[in-house]
C-alpha cells in the first residue's frame, strides 16, 4: 500500500514511516520542515528509511493534490504543537492545524483517496483542567480503557462522575 505521511520527517511521523516500510508498505513523506518543529532541518530520508520525500506545506493545495495521486491512504501527522512562545503564535497554529487539515481533506476528496488515519493530541486524552459544577476546577486522569471501549470519550469528574466542561 502506498501511504502518504504528512509531517513524516517529524518525531512521530518518522516512526510511522519506519513502521510502514518494515510492514512492506511504500511510505511517501510530505513535510514543510518548519523551523519551529525542525530547528536543524533533517536531510530527506535521514529520520527514517528511504522514502519518497516531498518538501511542501500541507496548506499548499496544489502540492497536496499532486502528492495524493497514486496514494492509497493518508496518515496525517503534520501539525504545530503547543502555542510556541505566546498567544501571538495562535494564527500560525490554527492555520497549520485547521487549514492544513481542511486542505488535505479537500484534496483527498478531489483525488478519491478515501483512507485516513488522523492524529489526535494530548487534549483528546484528558490533558488540562476541567470544571465540575459541584467541585469546581478538577484535573481528571487518563481515560479508563473500559470507558473508551464503551464509547465514553468525554472526561468525568474524578470525585462525583459528573460531566465536565473544559476549564
Q: What is the role of each PLM region?
A:
Residues 1-167:
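N-terminal Rossmann-like NAD(P)+-binding domain of SDR-like oxidoreductases, especially those catalyzing
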Amino acid at each position: 500500500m502506498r501511504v502518504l505521511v504528512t509531517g513524516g520527517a517529524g518525531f512521530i511521523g518518522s516512526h510511522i514511516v519506519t513502521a510502514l516500510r518494515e510492514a512492506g508498505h511504500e511510505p511517501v513523506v510530505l513535510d514543510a520542515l518548519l523551523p519551529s518543529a525542525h530547528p536543524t532541518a533533517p536531510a530527506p530520508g535521514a529520520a527514517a528509511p528511504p522514502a519518497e520525500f516531498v518538501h511542501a506545506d500541507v496548506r499548499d493545495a496544489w502540492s497536496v493534490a499532486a502528492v495524493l495521486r497514486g496514494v492509497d491512504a493518508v496518515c496525517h501527522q503534520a501539525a504545530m504543537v503547543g502555542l510556541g512562545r505566546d498567544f501571538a503564535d495562535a494564527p500560525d497554529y490554527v492555520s497549520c492545524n485547521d487549514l492544513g487539515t481542511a486542505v488535505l481533506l479537500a484534496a483527498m476528496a478531489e483525488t478519491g483517496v478515501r483512507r485516513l488515519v488522523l492524529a489526535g493530541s494530548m487534549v483528546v486524552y484528558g490533558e488540562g483542567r476541567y470544571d465540575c459544577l459541584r467541585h469546581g476546577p478538577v484535573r481528571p486522569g487518563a481515560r479508563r480503557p473500559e470507558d473508551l471501549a464503551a464509547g465514553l470519550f468525554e472526561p468525568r469528574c474524578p470525585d462525583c462522575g459528573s460531566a465536565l466542561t473544559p476549564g
